[in-house]
């Protein structure tokens, strides 16, 4: 295809690397094909409201490689509101002369992108999530940065926990999958890690911590994914709230585990919830490179007519996969990875 007018947007939670994708799209579209790129602001809401800006291949675009967050802004939109606005979306894209749309986001965003593709809009999706739970791709950008933040926090908590003879609970993001907890726990030398894929036994956690204290190691580090749940009947949880999209909020599982460990063992137990700090800041070198490669490949896919696809990392190569492969199921931590992590507990 010749020169095109491409639109892009960022939707869902922010993460390091979004700007690197935008930069990759703009520079590739402009330099290789003479195309122009438009950015819709604040995700799907901006597309529905026709809030758009022209993105130029200039010094401003060049500088965003280092920046966290997204220059376009982001947001979440209820699927029902989005689907009800399909006619408006089509009209806005037509009025702006858009030939292709590149949505950048996680599972929910990619489901929305698939729905647009099913309704005749030329779409190329770019997977984004710090959780690393998008199926069909080995890694999503933002994950490495989040793991680095969590690992740094664990490194720092080792010294304060040891100084005060404490058990430290570190709660990290991961509503349905435990990739951040698993990787940060291994990299940070945690003494136990709890992930959503494997229901935990509070008695086993307490046993591990008590064994450490008996052996003279007067502190412990436990990493907990926010979506972790206990084995049925082993621990009673306090109910979480439900957000505007019907999702139960899991923040607080770390404190609940801390309370139970303290009740059973009597040790001083403190909780650190990393929360949104995992989303912020400068992307790691790995995420900058991966996000740039995603942006370049997405722009090229548009000009090659490879629509209704998603860019993905397979081994060392960036490939195009179907929306069905990307959004069919979540990519969860395999049991063999969990077994490997267990060998480091204690």
From Swiss-Prot:
Q: Name one GO biological process term.
A: fructose 1,6-bisphosphate metabolic process
Q: Which residues bind substrate?
A: 129-131, 166, 173-175, 226, 270, 276-279
Q: In which pathway does it act?
A: Carbohydrate degradation; glycolysis; D-glyceraldehyde 3-phosphate and glycerone phosphate from D-glucose: step 3/4
Give the PROSITE patterns listed for this entry. Answer: PHOSPHOFRUCTOKINASE
EC assignment: the record states 2.7.1.11
List all disulphide bridges recorded for this chain.
Answer: none
Q: What does this protein do?
A: Catalyzes the phosphorylation of D-fructose 6-phosphate to fructose 1,6-bisphosphate by ATP, the first committing step of glycolysis.
Q: What is this protein called?
A: ATP-dependent 6-phosphofructokinase
Q: Which organism is it from?
A: Corynebacterium efficiens (strain DSM 44549 / YS-314 / AJ 12310 / JCM 11189 / NBRC 100395)
Q: Give the gene name.
A: pfkA
